[in-house]
């Protein structure tokens, strides 16, 4: 089985480049206070997301190691192939579960961010309002990138499941296996592209939020 087998790409889906701020200082107008509260809640609501990212990364590393072990074997080790493939399938199912939990965290964050946008619309100071709109624009792009990334990751998971089921087929041909690996690799390539965009927009949002807080007269320091 190992001769001529294509390697499957590993993937680390977009790590959230989180920046949490502690605010001290003057109290702004009510819309600013409301906006600040919502933005801080957004960060809190994404803490489970960050934990799920770590779990997914660990599962991905383990699953990739299992895959590498499988392709080193030949059909004389069929029972071992089945055992490792089943273990990999269990791992994929766990990733699917944790992806759903990650999605839930982002959905809650996005819902809270809508509250922040409503508060921003009521800010009277045009300069500060413009800063808030810039932050909101980057956050929207960030959520869009995550949505695309998550959707593609779900497809990749389905392709992984099919791959490990194929590996248990005694009549599996090298050509058929390579085709499935190529499909999975193509899917993960799209995941990585959206992951990169997600990270870029996260960094831009964090900078825009800092600029917003500065303009609003808050004193900011990283926690």
Task: Briefly describe each language-model feature range.
Residues 47, 51-54, 61, 90, ...:
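Extended, heptad-repeat alpha-helical coiled-coil/oligomerization scaffolds
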Residues 15-20:
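Hydrophobic helical h-region of N-terminal Sec-dependent signal peptides
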Residues 190-223:
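Extracytoplasmic/luminal low-complexity segments enriched in Pro/Gly and acidic/polar residues
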Residues 27-100, 104, 221:
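Immediate post-signal-peptide N-terminus of mature secreted/exported proteins
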Residues 3-14:
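Bacterial N-terminal signal peptides that target proteins for export
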């Amino acid at each position: 089985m190992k001769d001529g087998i294509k390697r499957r790409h590993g993937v680390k889906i977009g790590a959230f480049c989180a920046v949490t701020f502690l605010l001290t200082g003057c109290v702004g107008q009510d819309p600013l206070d409301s906006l600040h509260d919502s933005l801080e809640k957004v960060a809190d609501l994404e803490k489970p997301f960050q934990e799920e990212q770590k779990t997914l990364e660990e599962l991905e590393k383990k699953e990739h190691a299992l895959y590498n072990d499988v392709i080193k074997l030949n059909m004389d080790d069929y029972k071992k192939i089945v055992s490792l493939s089943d273990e990999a399938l269990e791992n994929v199912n766990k990733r699917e579960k944790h992806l759903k939990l990650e999605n839930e965290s982002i959905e809650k964050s996005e819902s809270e961010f809508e509250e922040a946008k409503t508060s921003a619309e009521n800010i009277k100071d045009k300069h500060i309002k413009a800063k808030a709109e810039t932050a909101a624009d980057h956050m929207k792009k960030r959520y869009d990138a995550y949505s695309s990334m998550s959707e593609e990751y779900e497809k990749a998971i389905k392709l992984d499941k099919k791959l490990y089921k194929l590996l248990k087929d005694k009549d599996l041909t090298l050509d058929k296996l390579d085709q499935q690996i190529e499909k999975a690799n193509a899917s993960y390539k799209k995941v990585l592209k959206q992951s990169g965009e997600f990270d870029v927009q996260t960094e831009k949002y964090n900078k825009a939020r800092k600029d917003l807080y500065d303009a609003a007269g808050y004193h900011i320091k990283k926690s």
